[in-house]
């Protein structure tokens, strides 16, 4: 049985529901850029969900994110000056509070002007720093504040001990966010895209059975023994002397968490596929671990082999884009593609929940076992 990737809540490939690929998910945190890029009073440009942002730090080092458009003449605020508290537009000198976006000063106003500059706002977005990234909470395209909205804390990578190593990788993906995410969660491409003696090959393909369960805004591959046909997992057992388990979560809008545990040792990672524009995403990967920190095997795998994996995935997406120009309907085949289908159904359920103001109806009703070969 197969499914069209565009049906969201339907089991029929013959139906033709709306395409969700162009829909941006608002009301979530997204990583905007690495925190180390924003230093002193320097202003940095970023783009999330086709919204231009200007990002900086106040005098205390707290990050802020404004819509990079002056409400006066649409001049980019990122060309302006920042004094540690206010951003000044380089066109007419209008000044805006760095965190609220409220206009503080308009140099051209005379003393008897009736214009209340404090009623003018540049778009602003809640901003926090976690795991070496500056995150922006994308409320809406205009950056309008909603006093009634409850903003959750920014995502944070789970760590299981006070002392650990951490590493980060990034890459641009020339695709829509949906294409990037269903590629991220695809379990069957490894033996073909990531062939290597130290990873997998066509000869290593075998039957897999994994149990999944619902979690808020996502689903979990329940803790299980890692793939026996992957050399890094064999090496992990050799190093630690402990049997390993791995658990994988996907959480809307764009996060994949993986946690590997072997006795007292652990590795925790998060991968996000963030829409920059409708046809461009950014992949951000961060991992933390306490596995023999004095022995650089994990660091080597992440810094040397990790970029190779990402390049292979990027190349596949680039080539897939050549075909998507002519055919944007993709088949989703049970059970290997069920996670992709859940992703589309989660997006639809979230949209319906927001429309009706009712609790979201989760597409994964309970524990279920999926089977495929990889």
What are the residue ranges of the model-derived segments?
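C-terminal catalytic domain of Rieske-type non-heme iron oxygenases
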Residues: 62, 143-374
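Non-catalytic accessory segments flanking enzyme active sites
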Residues: 25-26, 192
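Sequence-level motif detector for i,i+2 pairs with an aromatic at +2
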Residues: 27-29, 41, 122, 131, ...
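Enriched - but not universal
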Residues: 29-32, 97, 200-201, 345
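A generic structural signal for short, non-catalytic loop/turn and secondary-structure boundary residues
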Residues: 23-25, 48, 120, 129, ...
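Short, mixed-charge, low-aromatic patches
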Residues: 2-4, 21-25, 130-137, 226-227, ...
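Rieske [2Fe-2S] iron-sulfur-binding domain
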Residues: 1-2, 6-13, 17-21, 31-159, ...
